[in-house]
């Protein structure tokens, strides 16, 4: 017999494509010790990753033991001590004390004025800050603010009142947040609110004009991201640009709320990645989190508890090498306070559309872009789904689906047995929403399932397999009799099991014209590689 095992959260709102294996979620609260990564050959430099401003909201999982682990591991391999910052209290200078670089991945909760002051002071006194943003309207927790707005310091269409349209509870959660053109005033750049896709940043400033940051860099990937506007060329400089000739028709993100492309790409669109100098310290900026992430998310979605899906961006193009070189530059203190003193060519200020001026902006469409599901509220961790960061509750075990078939399904209308087994149900739980079919490439249905009364359906396609009831251990098993359309002549097909019309198992099966003895094979166990992450005893 041929057997395949799949795992699914039976109550999950989102189920991804066939053979996506559920990732075990280790729920942690904001008060749990943060992860720490220590190098075997330390270079004496310390890096702090922020996880106190919604970095795990929605499908994001921007933590050093989750979907930013490739980045963190690469830094550790280069000698950096890496830690996550997690706290329910505002960020302070004391939190940043002792660190060389502070990395802010795609924040979803605004910084209070005292936090902005702490970040600016950290840079002024010699620290390096790396701002990782995304595209406009990448609002993952439905608080009407995306990372570009948060890092800029002001909300599009609400420059005079950043809490415009919010509930009293939301306004209370944002006490101490003040609207201002903070990033431009402190660091000389502003994240644009564009949303660009279907291209690559392959116009790279030479290493000689970029302090070596772009050494061996030919291209950086972008998957729905933004660019920056250079406001003060004395302290801000682009290092990677998108191509010229971009158009809204070809290059705007599919869900962009405006034209998406503001200046046709190239230099006028502004840099995709940039660097900055502030006092004794430095800054770096990039308009997309996609090139930083990897495919190992740790937590569940805080809104609905679904399994997250992230992508291997860090290993795409020259992304990984670039980000490590950015941190190398940020961690090195240098005495010049502006780029003119450093003797490199200065950029021109970026052109701005009138609608990009903070006081002239309008809200292109109502925010948030949709209402949250259920009782989820971004400001109340007690509403976060089990398995998400901040919930403190372990995610329920995912239902495991086991499908056992003959090694080859017989043709010619001959009957055969298929056994379906579900594990990790509640004891005595019943499931009556399963159906199954065999189909050919291209989608032609070729199977029937015999009813419990011995009758056969009049058509080929999906058919219910009946009710399964779990035993005391949460396991339910049912064997059904099937047959294929006798007119079929093929060597292989697909068998698919669905639960409530959602695909849970899809497997290739061989077809044979003759009756053959079949043998039972052991269950295919698909395991997930889990990263072992040292955890601080006290105290990302």
Describe each region flagged by the PLM.
Residues 110-210:
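A glycine-rich, often tryptophan-bearing local segment used as a flexible ligand/cofactor-contacting loop or short
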Residues 55-68:
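Glycine- and acidic-residue-enriched helix-capping/strand-helix junction motifs
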């Amino acid at each position: 017999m041929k057997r395949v095992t799949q795992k699914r959260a039976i109550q999950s709102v989102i189920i991804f494509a066939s053979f996506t294996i559920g990732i075990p979620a280790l729920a942690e609260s904001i008060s749990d010790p943060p992860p720490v990564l220590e190098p075997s050959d330390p270079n004496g430099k310390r890096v702090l990753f922020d996880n106190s401003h919604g970095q795990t909201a929605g499908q994001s999982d921007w933590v050093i033991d989750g979907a930013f682990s490739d980045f963190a591991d690469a830094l550790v391999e280069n000698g950096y001590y890496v830690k996550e910052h997690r706290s329910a209290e505002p960020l302070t200078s004391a939190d940043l004390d002792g660190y060389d670089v502070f990395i802010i991945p795609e924040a979803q909760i605004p910084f209070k004025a005292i936090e902005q002051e702490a970040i600016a002071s950290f840079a002024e006194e010699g620290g390096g800050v790396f701002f990782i943003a995304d595209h406009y309207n990448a609002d993952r927790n439905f608080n009407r603010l995306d990372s570009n707005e948060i890092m800029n310091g002001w909300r599009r269409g609400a420059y005079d009142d950043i809490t415009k349209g919010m509930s009293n509870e939301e306004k209370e959660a944002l006490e101490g947040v003040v609207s201002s053109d903070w990033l431009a005033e402190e660091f000389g750049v502003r994240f644009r609110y564009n949303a660009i896709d279907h291209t690559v940043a392959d116009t790279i400033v030479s290493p000689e004009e970029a302090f070596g940051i772009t050494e061996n860099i030919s291209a950086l990937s972008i998957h729905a991201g933004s660019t920056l506007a250079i406001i003060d060329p004395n302290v801000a400089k682009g290092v990677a640009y998108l191509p010229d000739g971009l158009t809204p028709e070809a290059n705007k993100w599919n869900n962009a709320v405006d034209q998406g492309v503001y200046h046709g790409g190239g230099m006028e669109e502004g840099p995709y990645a940039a660097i900055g100098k502030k006092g004794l310290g430095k800054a770096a900026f990039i308009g997309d989190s996609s090139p930083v992430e990897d495919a190992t998310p740790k937590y569940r979605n805080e809104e609905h508890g679904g399994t997250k899906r992230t992508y291997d961006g860090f290993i795409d193009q020259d992304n990984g090498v670039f980000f490590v070189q950015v941190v190398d530059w940020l961690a090195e203190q240098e005495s010049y306070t502006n780029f003119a003193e450093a003797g490199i060519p200065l950029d021109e200020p970026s052109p701005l559309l009138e609608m990009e001026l903070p006081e002239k902006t309008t809200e292109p469409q109502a925010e948030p872009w949709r209402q949250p599901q259920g009782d989820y509220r971004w400001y109340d961790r007690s509403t976060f789904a089990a398995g998400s960061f901040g919930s403190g509750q372990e995610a329920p075990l995912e239902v495991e689906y086991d499908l056992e078939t003959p090694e080859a399904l017989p043709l010619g209308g001959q009957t055969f047995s298929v056994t379906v087994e579900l594990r990790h149900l509640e004891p005595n739980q019943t499931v009556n929403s399963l159906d199954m079919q065999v189909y050919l490439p291209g989608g032609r249905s070729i199977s029937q399932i015999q009813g419990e009364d011995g009758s056969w359906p009049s058509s080929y396609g999906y058919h219910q397999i009946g009710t399964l009831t779990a035993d005391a251990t949460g396991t339910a098993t049912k064997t059904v009799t099937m047959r294929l359309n006798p007119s079929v002549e093929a060597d292989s097909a697909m068998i698919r099991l669905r639960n409530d019309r959602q695909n849970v198992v899809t497997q290739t099966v061989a077809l044979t014209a003759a009756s053959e003895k079949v043998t039972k094979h052991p269950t295919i166990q698909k395991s997930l590689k889990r990263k072992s992450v040292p955890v601080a005893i006290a105290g990302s």
